[in-house]
Regions:
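Short helix-loop-beta junction
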Residues: 1-6
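A conserved amphipathic helix/loop scaffold
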Residues: 8-9, 13-19, 25-186
């Protein structure tokens, strides 16, 4: 499987935020950064060797609200323009792969929702992530029909009906089936 975690933009000033993080997928579709300073930390992380995958067309109506990127002397059409500029790219780079320091910026000019709403678009997204993972980690992504998340004493597991295989997931120990109204211990 692939180790996945959420990174909150507001936490970028803390060094621990990027600890162990190799690839970061981000978008400003319908959500915008509260402060331009966050881009300093993102750009620094990429420069040191991180891979940033930016997904977005930057055309949603929230680009035009009066915010830091278009007030107080800033003349950016979208906050991403400031981020790209920080990484020595053009303000509006086309879809492609770019180097910045020891790191890489991959721009996918697609609104993230279209990866699931347009038939076949998920494959392009997956292949981009898989390629970045292979480049950075040196391993192929192992696709499975199940998810397992462990947090402390809790294990959350699910098997997908529509997936790469019909292989059952086997776990040892005692578990409660939350999808059964009687909550049996298995």
């Amino acid at each position: 499987g692939i180790p996945v975690e959420l990174v909150h933009m507001e936490n970028t000033p803390f060094k621990e935020t990027f600890k162990g993080l190799h690839i970061l997928v981000m978008s400003y579709s319908n959500m915008k950064p509260m402060k331009l300073e966050y881009h300093n930390y993102l750009a620094d992380w990429v420069k040191k060797g991180g891979i940033l995958i930016y997904c977005g067309e930057d055309i949603d109506p929230y680009q035009t609200v009066l915010e830091w990127w278009n007030t107080d002397g800033n003349e950016y059409k979208a906050p991403s323009e400031h981020l790209f500029e920080k990484m020595n790219l053009s303000r509006n780079p086309g879809e492609g792969t770019y180097r910045y320091g020891k790191g890489t910026v991959i721009v996918m000019r697609e609104d993230p929702k279209h990866f699931v709403l347009k038939a076949g678009n998920d494959q392009k997204y997956f292949e981009t992530i898989a390629s970045a993972y292979q480049k950075k980690i040196g391993k192929e992504i192992e696709t499975k029909n199940s998810f397992i998340v462990e947090r402390g004493p809790y294990t959350i597991a699910a098997v997908m009906d529509e997936s790469v295989s019909k292989e059952p997931l086997t776990l040892s120990g005692l578990y409660i089936d939350l999808f059964d109204k009687d909550l049996p211990v298995l």
